[in-house]
Amino acid sequence: MDLPIVLSHKTAWLYHNVARPSEPLSRASSLYDEDSLANEAEPTANLPKLGLDAKGLRASTAVGIVADYLVSLGIPREELDHIDTLVNFDFERSTPAGFRCHVFGAPVPPGHLIEVAEGLLVVDEAMCFVQAGSWMSEPEQLEYGYEICARYHLNHLSTGDYIEMGQRYTVADLIAYC
């Protein structure tokens, strides 16, 4: 594909629920700003190579590649009837079955994209929290806000148990993003 795929909304939330890395992830500062991606301070050599950068890759093939990768991380396949992605323009929404495109018609604020594989980015949890208002109930979103500002995480996808972990964001971080 010519541009990276950016996971957003519920797909990003699912990703963040299974991929709690112990090391910081590589951050890209803007969705379509080639300079910000080229000047990454952290090397991307250790990122998984999924084949999303192949010339002439069909979108339907990309859906399968991304879905397989997410399943390999532990996301149940039945949660992936569609993959939420972020696009810049409304005309980019015409995609094959499997992608659900959400228009974000401005550059993504610096630091709010995380590169998880070559050609695959995910919005960070601050941005995902704001997007969650489109599909979570108010109590669910409130719980999610507590989780990302607290020192624990509820593992929604497997055990349903709370896990202690370092604080990821502060309330001020969320307010600054909004």
Feature locations, PLM:
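Short gly/ser-rich loop at a beta-strand->alpha-helix junction or flexible surface loop bordering the NTP-binding
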Residues: M1-C178
